[in-house]
From Swiss-Prot:
GO terms for cellular component: host cell plasma membrane; membrane; viral envelope; virion membrane. One of its GO terms (biological process) is symbiont entry into host cell. It is found in: Virion membrane; Host cell membrane. It comes from Orgyia pseudotsugata multicapsid polyhedrosis virus (OpMNPV). It is a single-pass membrane protein. Residues 1-17 form the signal peptide. This is Major envelope glycoprotein. Gene3D superfamilies: 2.40.50.710, 6.10.250.2130, 6.10.250.3010, 6.20.460.10. InterPro entries: Baculovirus_Gp64 (IPR004955).
Length: 509
């Protein structure tokens, strides 16, 4: 009997592992916690059918202007109340046929320059008021007010004109009910003006007409859209809907036409769009067509792009989080299954020296254990790590030093798709269009010539320095010399007469 007891003790001694667990200090019961898997608020919907209507960003507009300055004067002397200068400054509307011909010839037609027409010639001020017969590439008027012909009328008339085929920006507008679209021209403030190929528009001192009729094209495409649901309680509600069209981002949240510059886009929405955040409300006018200086519309569109990128990033993070939680729950099931065979698995995963004992399929107890210190061999004292356990070992030939181990890659690193900002197209301010620059320049030229000319233009001549009309200085000097010469002769004659009288007087002695 004693031999049997000794044999059992020896077996226990040589078979005991290098670690021991205390069954008296069990804790629990425990159950691995499952992680919640939440669906993202963002949904990426592919193959969304949209309709795109597009026109040219700008159109060729023929712009022309014509006018004249006229001074009809009468010189009756300073004592005559009828002495006056009647000034007329008039801008003429250019007819459609004339404007089209101007555009073809790149010349404008005016009347003959009338310079210092006096006497009967001054009647020219009442003829050829429409300005015909002289073709020029463009000219500015010269202000003349000659009135130096005594007791006569004087006429001066000078013409101005110009023509240019320039670009003006367009805006495409589509009706939400009928889907009819039209192209309008934008003025310097970005406001639509009625410039067509059939009728001349007269405004701002110029006449303008479209060189050819504006056209637009329609096409249907399938694109990808990102749907944002801010209300998790209502899965059918959509707050924003970003669609990627030709590498550009558009907000198509409502079943209406979204028009930006020269393009309109519309989709048939199946979702209920709720009220959007205060900075993005559909009941306010769209901000993408506010073509102010620095193109505010482009800046607003960049903000739309940033919102899209933020929503897309948030969707990717939420999808990743949900997927990781799903993988974690699958890993939990796998750990529970393996831990029923390897009682130290759960402790090793928690980096604690504990052992598990299962009470049911997913409930277990934990007990503290002792572990050998870190080592670089599969042997420790009289134990060997074998088949996932520390067991007794008497054969030292089975010990292996794994200090110089090698790593074996069994999977690849994940490559993420990094989103980038869309290909935003930038637009100049409306007032930067060449057509409005031409109009502004002709106004500047008119102001300059009216300020700097009076008698045909300032030069270095004495008449211009004295601010006198042509011939007026000559007449003044002639009158001055003639008057003073007559006075001189008269005085000399009187003196000679007196001298003669004194000499002929008889002497009395």
């Amino acid at each position: 009997m004693v031999r049997i007891v000794v044999f059992i003790l020896l077996c226990v001694r040589f078979s005991a592992p290098a670690e021991h667990c205390n069954a008296q200090m069990k804790s629990g019961p425990w159950r691995i916690k499952s992680l919640p898997i939440a669906a993202p608020k963002e949904t990426l919907q592919k193959d969304v059918e949209i309709e795109i209507v597009e026109t040219d960003l700008d159109q060729n507009v023929v712009i022309g202007y014509k006018g004249y300055y006229q001074a009809y004067a009468y010189n009756g002397g300073s004592l005559d109340p009828n002495s006056r200068v009647e000034e007329t400054m008039k801008t003429l509307d250019v007819a459609k046929e004339d404007l089209l011909m101007w555009g073809i010839r790149q010349q404008c037609e005016v009347g003959e320059e009338l310079i210092d027409q006096w006497g009967s010639d001054s009647e020219s001020c009442f003829r050829n008021m429409d300005g015909r017969g002289v073709w020029v590439a463009g000219k500015e008027l010269v202000k003349r007010q000659n009135n130096n012909h005594f007791a006569h009328h004087t006429c001066n008339r000078s013409w101005r004109c110009g023509v240019s085929t320039a670009k003006m920006y367009t805006r495409l507008e589509c009706d939400d009910d009928t889907d009819d679209c039209k192209v309008t021209i934008l003025d310097i403030n970005g406001t639509s003006i009625n410039v067509t190929e059939n009728k001349v528009l007269h405004r701002d001192g110029v006449s303008m007409i479209l060189k050819q009729k504006s056209t637009f094209s329609r096409r249907t495409e399938k694109v990808a859209c990102l749907l944002i649901k801010d209300d998790k309680a209502d899965p059918n509600s959509v707050t924003r809907e970003h669609c990627l069209v030709d590498n550009d981002i558009f907000d198509l949240s409502k079943n209406t036409w979204f028009c930006k510059f020269n393009r309109c886009i519309k989709r048939r929405s199946e979702n209920v769009v709720k009220q959007r955040p205060h900075t993005w409300r559909h009941d306010r006018p769209p901000k993408h067509d506010e073509g102010a200086t620095a193109t505010k519309g482009d800046l607003m569109h960049i903000q739309e792009e940033l919102m899209y990128e933020n929503d897309l990033l948030r969707m990717n993070l939420e999808l990743m989080h949900a997927h990781i939680n799903k993988l974690n729950n699958m890993m939990h099931d796998l750990i529970v299954s393996v831990a029923k065979v390897d009682e130290r698995l759960i402790g090793n995963l928690m980096n604690n020296s504990v052992s598990s004992t299962f009470l049911s399929d997913d409930t277990f107890l934990l007990m503290p254990c002792t572990s050998p210190p870190p080592h670089t061999s599969n042997c420790y004292n009289n134990s060997i790590y074998k088949e996932g356990r520390w067991v007794a070992n008497t054969d030292t030939s089975q010990c292996i030093d794994f200090n110089n181990y090698k790593e074996l890659a069994i999977d690849d690193d994940i490559e993420f798709w990094i989103p980038t900002i869309g290909n935003t197209s930038y637009h100049e301010s409306w007032k930067d269009a060449s057509g409005w620059s031409f109009i502004a320049q002709q106004k500047s030229n008119l102001i300059s010539t009216m300020e700097n000319t009076k008698f045909g233009g300032h030069t270095t001549s004495l008449s211009d320095i004295a601010d006198m009309a042509k011939g007026e200085l000559n007449a003044t000097l002639y009158s001055f010399m003639l008057g003073h010469g007559f006075t001189f002769v008269l005085i000399v004659g009187v003196i000679l007469f007196l001298v003669c009288m004194l000499r002929n007087r008889p002497s009395h002695y």
